[in-house]
């Protein structure tokens, strides 16, 4: 196994970036995300951007958790459509999700 203490879990992809307000929109395609989650956004131009989800908005309303199939927006430095969104989960937490190891 890997000695890393964190694993990345695919969440979804970038849809749009609103540069005038510094907000990124993502579509959740796989794992849900919740406020407080540590995130990693990657892409060919973007590189790797680490962030913590301080506030997620679905249809402009703040939510605690964003579920699969939902679009959400968050304050973020520039990202690009098609960037991939992951959440970083400690290997300890991962053990709670059976079948991922």
Task: Give, region by region, the residue ranges found by the protein language model.
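Beta-strand/loop-dominated core regions that host nucleotide or nucleotide-derived cofactor-binding catalytic loops
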Residues: 3-101
């Amino acid at each position: 196994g890997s000695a890393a203490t964190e694993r990345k879990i695919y969440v979804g992809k970038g849809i749009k970036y609103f540069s005038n307000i510094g907000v990124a929109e993502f579509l959740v395609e796989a794992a849900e995300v919740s406020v407080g989650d540590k995130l990693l956004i990657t892409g060919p131009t973007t590189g790797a951007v680490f962030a913590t989800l301080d506030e997620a908005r679905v249809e402009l309303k703040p939510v605690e958790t964003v579920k699969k199939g939902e679009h959400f927006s968050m304050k973020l430095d520039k990202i690009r459509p098609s960037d991939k969104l992951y959440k970083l989960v400690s290997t300890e937490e991962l053990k709670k999700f059976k079948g991922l190891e």
